[in-house]
Amino acid sequence: MRAYFVLLVAATAILTYGGATATYSTSKGEMNLTGTVENNRPTRSLRVAPSGGNGEERSWSTIYGISRSKAETVRDWLMPRLNQGMDVQALAREMGITSRQAATQHQNWDALVKYLKMYNYAVRGEKMSKSMAESVLLHNVLTAKNNF
């Protein structure tokens, strides 16, 4: 224990005397800064995560290998099929959802839920919540009777 203490004191003395630590300069032209630099601009005091800034949206669905945003998926993919009257089972197969077990983890699950909500509104004129649409898909649409 005493040997470690002596070694620690000796190392500290050598580093302090040798100039390995930050130096203090008395000249006015030289200044060592440690810490934050003050700024006169009004800024937020909280840190903010950097924004993406490139204008790209995150992929919401991937259909036939093409990544699409939510707006593109609804406009270019779901609305034309809704206008054609495509049923939900056919759309699920077209999107690549083939089994009930893996359906909720599929990359196009949210698009299928959105389509069921749109389909229900077009046919019945009633709005459906997302949780209700997910339940209907799992218990009534993606069943063994429908070959899922």
From Swiss-Prot:
Record's keyword annotation contains Protease: no
Motif RxLR-dEER, residue numbers: 44-58
Keywords annotated in UniProt: Glycoprotein, Host cell membrane, Host cytoplasm, Host membrane, Membrane, Secreted, Signal, Virulence
Signal peptide: 1-22
Residue ranges of the TM segments: none
Subcellular location: Secreted; Host cytoplasm; Host cell membrane
Residues glycosylated per entry: 32
Record's GO cellular component terms: extracellular region; host cell cytoplasm; host cell plasma membrane; membrane
Similarity comment: Belongs to the RxLR effector family.
Domain notes: The RxLR-dEER motif acts to carry the protein into the host cell cytoplasm through binding to cell surface phosphatidylinositol-3-phosphate.
Function: Effector that suppresses flg22-induced post-translational MAP kinase activation in tomato but not in Arabidopsis. The perception of highly conserved pathogen- or microbe-associated molecular patterns (PAMPs/MAMPs), such as flg22, triggers converging signaling pathways recruiting MAP kinase cascades and inducing transcriptional re-programming, yielding a generic antimicrobial response. Also partially attenuates INF1-triggered cell death.
Protein name, per record: RxLR effector protein SFI7
Source organism per UniProt: Phytophthora infestans (strain T30-4) (Potato late blight agent)
